[in-house]
From Swiss-Prot:
This is 26S proteasome regulatory subunit RPN2. Acts as a regulatory subunit of the 26S proteasome which degrades poly-ubiquitinated proteins in the cytoplasm and in the nucleus. It is essential for the regulated turnover of proteins and for the removal of misfolded proteins. The proteasome is a multicatalytic proteinase complex that is characterized by its ability to cleave peptides with Arg, Phe, Tyr, Leu, and Glu adjacent to the leaving group at neutral or slightly basic pH. InterPro entries: 26S_Psome_Rpn2, ARM-like, ARM-type_fold. Its main location: cytoplasm. Signal peptide: none annotated. GO terms for biological process: proteasome-mediated ubiquitin-dependent protein catabolic process; regulation of protein catabolic process. PC repeats lie at residues 311-343, 344-377, 382-416, 417-451, 498-532, 533-566, 567-601. The lineage of its organism: Eukaryota, Fungi, Fungi incertae sedis, Microsporidia, Unikaryonidae. The gene is RPN2. Belongs to the proteasome subunit S1 family. Pfam families: HEAT_2 (PF13646). PANTHER family: 26S PROTEASOME NON-ATPASE REGULATORY SUBUNIT, 26S PROTEASOME NON-ATPASE REGULATORY SUBUNIT 1. The keyword Repeat applies.
Amino acid sequence: MQTIRILPNIRALLRDGRESEAIDVINAHVDVVAPHIKDDLRYIKSSDPKTSLCLSKIYFVLEDYQQAIEYALRAGDLLVDDGSFYYTSIVYHMMDSADIGGDDRIRDFVLKVIGAEDVDDSLIGYLFSIKAYGLLKEALVKYISDGNDCRRLLDLLISLGEEEGCLKEIYGMLAEIGPGKKPFIFYVIDAYFYLEDVEKVKALIERLVKEDILLCYDVAFYTEDNYSPEIEVADQRVMSILSGEFKKKILGAFLLEKNLTSFKFLESIARTRTHYLGLANSLMNLGTSNDTLYRNNADIFGQSSEWAKFSEVASIGMIHLFNSNPYEILKNYLPSEVSQKEGGALMALGLIKAGTFSEEDTEYLLYFLDTEDTLTPELAYGVCLGLGLINMGSANREILNKLKELSKVDRTLLVEASVYGMGMLGLNSWSVELLEDLRTIAGETEFERVKRAVGISFSLVLMFSEEMFYDECNASNGDFKNYINELLYDKDSIMRANGVLSLGSAFVGTGRLGVISTLLPYINDGDDDVKRAAVIAIGLVCCDDRDLLVGTLEPLSENHNFFVRAAVAVVLGLFLSGTGDKVCTNILEALMYDTNSLVRQSACIGVGFITMQCNPELVPNYKRIIEKLNRLIVDKKESGAVELGAVLGRGLSEGGGRNIVFSVRNMSGITSADRIAGAVLFLHYWYWHPLISMVSLCALPTTVFCFNEDLEEEEIEIPTSSRYNNLLICLPDIKKARRFKQKPKEDKEIVIESPSVLTFGSRCTIKQREECGIDAPAILFVKKKK
């Protein structure tokens, strides 16, 4: 009340031209008098900093923030941090204005203010939002030099950079900062490759050879694991890592030596006379190089014919995944000039040599494409898939032209085979030309198989293409949007399913809620193929976020449509392989008792994935689940579909001698295109069973190694809990023994205790890594102990 009484004095001072005195009085009581003197502001003529600051405060109280900011800027050096509510608020309003863009004076003031602040996540986020890359670069350097873990922050910046179409600027900034310590140096390597500056990677590796050989090994391993570059350096130790020979050698030896596969258990499966014994054997011995069962039971496997035999021979490639001499292994199956033999052997060759870009192997496979007259469907598939696997993601124009020629023949299966090969070659290439070729093939055929293969290839080519949807400077981004939109609204249900799958592939691992909301309505599409594709696509988008994946798909596990329930089961299992996730194991166990055979099959496969390297201590219902799978294998009353699911699920649960999981992340923990391709192809096994072997592209050995400067074995000891025992639950008896025959007792459960200390080459499960704090890739390079 006392303050209100001074209003007449303020007005009198203003009207008498005594502005300075009036401003002093207003400043002392601005919060109260401001609403009452807004009509008297016209008497203020001065524009000096003191008056401007007072006017800013008045307009701030009046909530005219635009005017408040304008006068605050005119106040110049008088606008200082006095701890007042006004100062804090006006700065926040300026930050909002700078974020929107416009007045450079606001931006300069904000940058001046925040330049004096301590660097934290929120400051870096704000600098990114206003595109202040210069200050952002300085802030990042300080943030990292303070010893902060930058991984989560940089991952977020890169994700936002993709979404806002400024990824080039983000990576350019990281490249300018240059390599430092781990883990920042790996982001700089990503930047060099994104900017297509491989020479800088080579120069960095050559410098580290002289300065820090242990860090050099880390960099070389990361580079090979993620980019498989054609970099040559003089140091043979580093070169062995860059070529991939080092990784293949240590992983192959690990899987061979630590193989826990029980051949008695495999023999018990053989006694059930299942048609899928070869599949179970290949999964259980994946990467171990142990094909004893094949060699000892050649008569059983020799009875298969046509596509069944193709699948069995192709799956040999899974067993010898890390073998360095595939021609010796496959010599009895590989075709030659005088004998067509097995096309599956060519696919096996591709699985073993996947991603090597071997010219010798490519030339060998291309020979068969020149024999079109004698080219059988089995051989064509072997050639095309083999070429696609070996040259995956290379976009080799010569090979693509050969496959394009094959796609023009009037033989449906050969066209389908060529399309698969084209998609694998174009993996993650974002090639508009290749997309046009595939669209032409789809438009010229009426066969569902070919159209479906085109859709899978579309999804492979568009993989990880999210940034192209936001990059307005790139002319191709409109093409991508048009391709997918045309497919999403196509009258042909298969093409619609192809569009759904391609959208999920383009945004793989991003967790974009907008994309998920676009995909969810297709769950209610009138066609089952579209429903299934929608679930797979949602799984792809969410595959890097467990909570989002489970939260989105869990409600769909109770969907009225059995195709949706079936797809949910496989997708949850594959993307959470080896985690023993309790929520998902409960979902999948319930689906094992579904009324529909396809759902039960898919649930069996899903639990096979999710229970890998688990036991009853990690998963409470583990025994009940595995015993159910075992009963389904021996129960002859079950349908063939459920039998396939049970055998496949059991093979997966014992996969790789219990030393692997299946993951879309590589050893460095990065979601990689080739592994996503393996997942996409495997998830379409329902349409063509030989695609089951593609799951081997996702195989991830789980171990821990330690090497010194000479790449020699270095002993380590990492304490771990005793919760990771291996439990093998055997199959129940197929039939009861006669009373007068004494049947020898056999243990139905075999336990192999896990060590309490992890040493060099020990199995180290996903859960153990989390428990022991071991970062990917679990290959340590340390100084030699004296």
